[in-house]
Amino acid sequence: GAKNGVHPPLGWIPIQDARIRQHGYNVISAAFPVILPDGTALWEDGMDANVKVATPAEMCQAKAAGATMVMSIGGAAAAIDLSSSSVADKFVSTIVPILKRYNFDGVDIDIEAGLSGSGTFGTLSASQANLVRIIDGILAQMPSNFGLTMAPETAYVTGGSVTYGSIWGAYLPIIKKYADNGRLWWLNMQYYNGAMYGCSGDSYEAGTVKGFVAQTDCLDKGLVIQGTTIRVPYDKQVPGLPAQSGAGGGYMSPSLVGQAWDHYNGSLKGLMTWSINWDGSK
């Protein structure tokens, strides 16, 4: 898996550029649509400074060459007001036509702001409920084979082993819902820009094989929060890593990535990098 960031200073890489596949990327998560305060989603040239988007024909060309195309929603700068169901509904009503027009195969949830847990695992907060509302709203209007992936930061997932509430573990009930019902294609948890947590509140340094293994094993074993087990098996894990040191904290050299990957003897679904643009700019 891979992220295709739209950061203009790094240079534009056409979605159908043959080098993407030549370097091993078979999934492209196009990031990110602009979200207006009322929830309206924008996916167009100039939606952000100097940004271009692939045309529907270019998307089909990339897909014909073997790429799976996913739209990544959120990121550090594209927040959505999760306190409002009307904003959630507006987002769904404007993003679904875009997903259909541009021939996307799935959607990746990478919302990094505004999501907060209630403190009681069995009770969703308003923000969690509205994120579920968005996901369900999208899936209901797309084909049954339309994909769902998620790319949360560690605090929102394994951070729940430290405490459950606020951002800590806030993705866990959402991950559980879609992992258990079979709609989650895979989890792209970000193994960077933060501490790496095990299942017992233990913490590891980002960018290390030890931290990689601790988190990956924790998710496969199952994280227990207030008596509820949330499990993401190895074959639904696609750990996210920085493509180079400038892309984020916790960069792992290719040799370290190889050690971590080989530890699992091919049982992991794959690896994600942030991002194709960062990779191509090196």
UniProtKB/Swiss-Prot annotation:
PROSITE patterns: GH18_1 (PS01095), GH18_2 (PS51910). It is found in: Secreted. InterPro entries: Glyco_hydro18_cat, Glyco_hydro_18_chit_AS, Glycoside_hydrolase_SF, Glycosyl_Hydrlase18_Chitinase. Secreted chitinase involved in the degradation of chitin, a component of the cell walls of fungi and exoskeletal elements of some animals (including worms and arthropods). Participates in the infection process and directly acts in the penetration process of the host cuticle. It catalyses: Random endo-hydrolysis of N-acetyl-beta-D-glucosaminide (1->4)-beta-linkages in chitin and chitodextrins. This is Endochitinase 4. Its EC number is 3.2.1.14. The active site is at 112 (proton donor). Residues 1-282 form the GH18 domain. It comes from the Eukaryota. Its main location: secreted. One of its GO terms (biological process) is polysaccharide catabolic process. One of its GO terms (cellular component) is extracellular region. It is an enzyme of class 3 (hydrolase). The gene is chi4. GO terms for molecular function: chitin binding; endochitinase activity. Glycans are attached at residue 265. It holds the Pfam family Glyco_hydro_18. Belongs to the glycosyl hydrolase 18 family. Chitinase class V subfamily. Keywords: Carbohydrate metabolism, Chitin degradation, Chitin-binding, Glycoprotein, Glycosidase, Hydrolase, Polysaccharide degradation, Secreted, Virulence.
